Amino acid sequence: LSTQLLEPLYTKHIEKQLTTQAESITAELDKAIANGEALSAWSFGHLTVNTTFFDRLATQLYASGSLNSFCVDISDTTMRTIYKIENQSYCNLHETLLSDSANNDMIVSTAVAMRKKCRTTGGFVQTLNPPRLSGSAQLLVGRNTSGGEYTVLVTTSLVHVAEAGKVLSTVLPLSL
């Protein structure tokens, strides 16, 4: 059997993982906001973030290990990135290579459009096609915090051989 034959099931499997990731991030943001933590602030065009909170969040994401190649984009009401974790060789959302990922100041039309879409719809799932022929499609899940203070976008590649194997094993149980 080919992975292509199981593409809808495979995509649903990845979507479930991304949705869980996005919802757990928004839950952490909501909890911090409810506890009165200041997560980010703009002052005279300069961004300050709560590095303690976001470093802890990043550690939790890597420790969970549910996604091995992903991007997390957290933006505020200004539609600008306040925190980003880039862990893909190429990110269709930010249009960056992994080596370029430290630059949070870039305004990328794709990322801004997806943030706006999430704020407008309250949450969505979409496939991001690669900007060039040699790239791969990526699945994106967007969620907002309950009060609308932050938008969380999570993406991952749709080319995961290991994940395809897991899906195959659920469809075709093998007894060893």
Regions found by a protein language model. Give the residues of each.
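Alpha-helical transmembrane segments of integral membrane proteins
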Residues: 1-3, 171-176
